[in-house]
Every structure is written in structure tokens, then in C-alpha cells.
């Protein structure tokens, strides 16, 4: 539900256009239909995502008022009207803080102000990008700690081996215990809401039919 604010942005075709109201209406109707069927939806990319000149993932400097009147409108609607239970963070920075580790965005705005009670998930490799692209931390362990402490619940990396530097952040005590409890709790809460623990075992024949 990102806005197409610059036609030079290479992901413009993924959006509903440049109008916050239209994007909100389309987004709400899309996510609500799935949520009502018991499928968790994850609006993305929270928030803004495209910088000056359509530069994807680049730093963005918008005022809070501008964000409230434009880029945040579709997201707020998806959570409050569409009942989306998850949200994916954006690659970019907002005023010097990566969206994936941004407590103003993920805690103050999303949870405290809007009342969001789902889980937050990073885009693919977005936590690693905190270190590799934005250089706001010294290493991957610090990136993981900044993200979880800043309101992220799920780290999404593209290979299993990439979990190791983020695990080290927990082992070294860089991740606050209450932040870790929140992250784990939000994911478990979503699973309980879906009834996954009521039926913990899948039908192997059914799974084979869909995954063959």
C-alpha cells in the first residue's frame, strides 16, 4: 500500500497509485477479505519506501504531518479498518533511523497511537541492510539488536545461516529481555488467534497435494 509518489521509482506498478484515499480503500478491502477467512495479511512497506528521485530504499526526510496526510494513511486504514494482523517494514530510513529499527514508527505510532496488536516483520535482508546500506551500526549483531529493541518482532533473512549474527546479539545481552518477550509474544499470539495450536499437526496427504 505504498504510494506512487515518483514515476521514476521502479516499483510503482506494485502500488494502487498516488492517492492516499484510493490506496487506503483498495488496501482495506483486499486485506479484510483475507483476514475474515483466517489468513494473516501483511501490508508493506512501512513506511514511505521510496526516496527523492524514485530511489528505492534511500533515506527519506519527511515531516510527521506530511507522513500523516500521505504515506501513513493506507497503513492506518489497513490496521484499524481492515484488521491486518501483521506489517512489513521498509528498507529506507526516516530522518536518520532505519524503518526496521525505528521505535517512533514501530512502537510510538503503530502500537501506542494506532493500537496495533499484531506482529512486525522485516523485509528480506532489511535487518542486515541496517549495517550494509545505512551504516547506523557497526555489525550485524548490533543491527539485530537495534531492530528488536526498536519494535521489530520477526527478522526475515534469505538464508538460514544468516541467523547466526543476530542470535549472537541475544547471547551477548544486546537485546533487551522485554523486547524479546514482546517479539516472541506477538508471534505466538497470532498463532493462537489462528487456532494453529488447536490443530498442531497437518494432514500429510493434503500437504503433498498442494506442495507436489
Placement of each model-derived feature along the sequence:
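Glycoside hydrolase catalytic-domain context in secreted enzymes
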Residues: 1-212
Amino acid at each position: 500500500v505504498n504510494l506512487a509518489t515518483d514515476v521514476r521509482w521502479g516499483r510503482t506498478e506494485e502500488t494502487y497509485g498516488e492517492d492516499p484515499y484510493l490506496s487506503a480503500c483498495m488496501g482495506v478491502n483486499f486485506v479484510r477479505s483475507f483476514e475474515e477467512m483466517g489468513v494473516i495479511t501483511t501490508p508493506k512497506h512501512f513506511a514511505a519506501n521510496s526516496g527523492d528521485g524514485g530511489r528505492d530504499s534511500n533515506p527519506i526526510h519527511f515531516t510527521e504531518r506530511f507522513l500523516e496526510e500521505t504515506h501513513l494513511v493506507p497503513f492506518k486504514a489497513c490496521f484499524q479498518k481492515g484488521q491486518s494482523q501483521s506489517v512489513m517494514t521498509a528498507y529506507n530510513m526516516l530522518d536518520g533511523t532505519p524503518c526496521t529499527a525505528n521505535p517512533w514508527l514501530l512502537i510510538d505510532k503503530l502500537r501506542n497511537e494506532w493500537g496495533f496488536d499484531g506482529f512486525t516483520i522485516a523485509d528480506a535482508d532489511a535487518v542486515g541492510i541496517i549495517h550494509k546500506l545505512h551504516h547506523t551500526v557497526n555489525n550485524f549483531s548490533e543491527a539485530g539488536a537495534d531492530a528488536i529493541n526498536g519494535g521489530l518482532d520477526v527478522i526475515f533473512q534469505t538464508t538460514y545461516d544468516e541467523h547466526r549474527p543476530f542470535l549472537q546479539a541475544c547471547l551477548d545481552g544486546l537485546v533487551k529481555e522485554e523486547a524479546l518477550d514482546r517479539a516472541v509474544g506477538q508471534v505466538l499470539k497470532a498463532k493462537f488467534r489462528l487456532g494453529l495450536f488447536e490443530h498442531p499437526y497437518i494432514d500429510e496427504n493434503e500437504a503433498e497435494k498442494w506442495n507436489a
